[in-house]
């Protein structure tokens, strides 16, 4: 399992939100490229970038920062989400050196777009499912749909989606532990690998995910915990690697 540091971009700065609320943002750095360097030095093997402005505006807003990080670390897999609603945007990011694009809102509203994107950019597409009480939320979490996360995940199995980033909105940014039960249920219900997100507070939360012995969970995204120092990236990755060795 990979420990994946999150860099959330708002107005060019690295921030964290609580429960996806744009007016409840903590600025952690005015230099996201330097922040990426910090996590690379800590030994991360993948980065999770989110264009928060883009998620709300429906098109990339912090694209220059994303490109700068991708250029600085050409060998580091980077996944980007937020405002990805067209094939042109995906092409722009892929050309910039980004490894994966995360389709969120558009995946819920127009599932056929995921099929198109997977066909045009095989192996590059991740679907972001943000859920509240099992139902998928869209538009920067402003709207909760009537679509069940598990049903939508199954819908994408035939498309060749690389992974699903599953975020429990109620947990995100609150550091109260990840929704292990819902994450495991999704991983077991679908053949698509799952990346857990939202609520990870400390090494104990990583251990809980590992203890489920769910092969379908391939990573855990962490944000506020690594910025506030309750989780150490290197230590958490070492724990995951140890589990893999034991198997």
UniProtKB/Swiss-Prot annotation:
It catalyses: 1-(5-phospho-beta-D-ribosyl)-5-[(5-phospho-beta-D-ribosylamino)methylideneamino]imidazole-4-carboxamide = 5-[(5-phospho-1-deoxy-D-ribulos-1-ylimino)methylamino]-1-(5-phospho-beta-D-ribosyl)imidazole-4-carboxamide. It is an enzyme of class 5 (isomerase). It is found in: Cytoplasm. It holds the Pfam family His_biosynth. Keywords: Amino-acid biosynthesis, Cytoplasm, Histidine biosynthesis, Isomerase. GO terms for molecular function: 1-(5-phosphoribosyl)-5-[(5-phosphoribosylamino)methylideneamino]imidazole-4-carboxamide isomerase activity. Pathway: Amino-acid biosynthesis; L-histidine biosynthesis; L-histidine from 5-phospho-alpha-D-ribose 1-diphosphate: step 4/9. It comes from the Bacteria. Its main location: cytoplasm. Disulfide bonds: none annotated. Transmembrane segments: none annotated. One of its GO terms (cellular component) is cytoplasm. Its EC number is 5.3.1.16. The active site is at 8 (proton acceptor), 130 (proton donor). GO terms for biological process: L-histidine biosynthetic process; L-tryptophan biosynthetic process. Belongs to the HisA/HisF family. NCBIfam families: 1-(5-phosphoribosyl)-5-[(5-phosphoribosylamino)methylideneamino]imidazole-4-carboxamide isomerase. This is 1-(5-phosphoribosyl)-5-[(5-phosphoribosylamino)methylideneamino] imidazole-4-carboxamide isomerase. It comes from Stutzerimonas stutzeri (strain A1501) (Pseudomonas stutzeri). The gene is hisA.
